[in-house]
Curated annotation (Swiss-Prot):
Function recorded in the entry: One of several proteins that assist in the late maturation steps of the functional core of the 30S ribosomal subunit. Helps release RbfA from mature subunits. May play a role in the assembly of ribosomal proteins into the subunit. Circularly permuted GTPase that catalyzes slow GTP hydrolysis, GTPase activity is stimulated by the 30S ribosomal subunit.
BP GO annotations: ribosomal small subunit biogenesis
Binding positions for Zn(2+) per the UniProt entry: 273, 278, 280, 286
Cofactor binding summary note: Binds 1 zinc ion per subunit.
Organism listed in the record: Prochlorococcus marinus (strain MIT 9313)
Protein name, UniProt field: Small ribosomal subunit biogenesis GTPase RsgA
Organism superkingdom: Bacteria
InterPro entries: G_CP_dom, NA-bd_OB-fold, P-loop_NTPase, Ribosome_biogen_GTPase_RsgA, RsgA_GTPase_dom
SUPFAM superfamilies associated with the record: Nucleic acid-binding proteins, P-loop containing nucleoside triphosphate hydrolases
Family membership noted in the UniProt record: Belongs to the TRAFAC class YlqF/YawG GTPase family. RsgA subfamily.
Length: 321
């Protein structure tokens, strides 16, 4: 029997399709299977899977990025059943992706123009995940070298090491691919229209992801990615394209806002405030230098969060996007 030829095998959920899961196997040796008639190259094998009802009974949801065990494998039809889910090492809510090791925030230098408020919202959402955050500036070819250097210096002041890329000229793509090759699962996020999908098409030429134009009236991109799917960048490294949103949510916890700003978090390590519940406005004993660029944004976000807290105790959950 086909199921008897293969034991339970480990894999990662790389896509969801209606009621099915697409699982990429970690290891696969086709030469050991009498019934195998497919390719024997080194490409990872993907199986279309259903899930055991016992997972539902245990309340074990299965999402993209989950490491799972598949069984009852039909090699000829490339189908199987997900029997178990491994504990997650990390989790982001929106979109739901498990075991992320890095978040890549993509922001355009132009078309649409760079917006510090919007950029900060995406960066705060990325910082909440607790994994490495990489900042990428797209459409580098639309501004001069001097303008780019000013933007890079500015973002270094925010506490990041930004990289600039252009899908038109190819500049920076090699360096970005090298950076991503050292992380197991990187999620791309950012406003729609900044070129995330175009960037992935350049990094992964075998893909043909649909690219949308930027809206002329709003100067915002039209969403082209409708679901989350993982793509293999190189051996041991996957990347995800995610649906774009123009206004991600702020974190729900007022007291965690400050540490999500790297330039403010660094100040608190060196010059802690007198009181633990300091919000770094006009409180006595505050050790924060308020001359940093994003301080007005921090105060604005804090006021917005306070209004939301007053209007709805508990608020809505925070997520990546």
């Amino acid at each position: 029997m086909a199921a008897a030829e293969a034991p339970r095998l480990a894999g990662m959920v790389v896509a969801l399709q209606a009621n099915f899961l697409e699982v990429e196997l970690e290891t696969f040796n086709p030469s050991s299977l009498v019934s195998w008639t497919g390719s024997t190259d080194d490409e990872p094998l993907r199986l279309l899977c259903t899930r055991r009802t016992r997972l539902d009974h245990r309340g074990a949801a299965v999402h993209v990025g989950d490491r799972v065990w598949v069984e009852a494998i039909d090699w000829q039809e490339r189908r199987a059943v997900v029997g178990d889910v491994e504990p997650r090492q990390s989790w982001i809510n929106r979109p739901p992706v498990a075991n992320v090791t890095a978040v890549v925030v993509a922001l355009a230098v132009k078309q649409p123009c760079f917006d510090a408020d919007q950029a900060s919202r995406f960066l705060l959402s990325a910082e909440q995940t607790g994994v490495d955050v990489h900042l990428i500036l797209t459409k580098r070819d639309l501004i001069t070298s001097d303008q780019l250097e000013q933007q890079l210096v500015r973002l270094r002041g925010w506490g990041y090491r930004p990289m600039a890329v252009s899908v038109q000229t190819g500049e920076g793509l090699g360096a970005l691919k090298n950076k991503l090759s050292s992380t197991r699962l990187a999620v791309f996020c950012g406003p729609s229209g900044v070129g995330k999908t175009s960037l992935l098409n350049q990094l992964l030429p075998q893909l043909s992801l649909r690219v949308g134009a930027v809206s002329g009236r709003l100067k915002r991109g039209r969403h082209t990615t409708r679901h989350v799917e993982l793509f293999r960048l190189c051996e041991g490294s996957l990347v995800a394209d995610t649906p774009g949103f123009n206004r991600p949510e702020l974190p729900a916890d007022l007291r965690k806002l400050a540490v999500l700003f790297p330039e403010l978090d660094g100040q608190l390590e060196d010059y802690p405030c007198r009181f633990r519940d300091c919000f770094h406005r006009d409180e006595p004993g505050c050790g924060v230098d308020k001359s940093w660029e994003r301080y007005p944004i921090y105060k604005r976000f804090l006021e917005e969060m306070e209004c939301l807290t007053r209007s709805s105790r508990g608020g809505s959950g925070s997520g990546l996007l």
